[in-house]
C-alpha cells in the first residue's frame, strides 16, 4: 500500500498543529498539537465539532466553562496517557502546563468557521 498524502503543518502563535487527516465525506479529523510552554489557545467552542484529546508528552491544562451549571469554571490537568472528550458546545481553552505539551486530537470534521472565540489567549 502506498502513502495517500502528506500531513499538513500549521504554525500557530501558541505552537503548531500537524493535520494527519480532515475528511469531510467520512466526518473525521486527526491532528497532533504542540503547545509551547507558557502558551495557550483561545477560550472557544464548536457547534459541530466533537473532540477527544490524548496526551503524548507533557501536561495539558484544559479550562472548561460548565454551561450546564451556571457557567462554573472547571480546570482539568491532564498527563501522559490520559484522554478527555470535549462535546459540541463545550467552551474550552488549552494551556501548556509546566513545559511544552504534545497531544493527539481526534474529532469530527474540522471547519474554521465552526470555532467561536469567547476570548483570546490571556497568558
Where are these regions (language model features)?
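Short acidic-glycine-tyrosine-enriched beta hairpin
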Residues: 66-89
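Glycine- and acidic-residue-biased ligand/ion/polar-headgroup-sensing regions
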Residues: 48-67
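Short glycine/proline-enriched turns and hinge-like loops at secondary-structure junctions
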Residues: 45-47, 54-55, 96-99
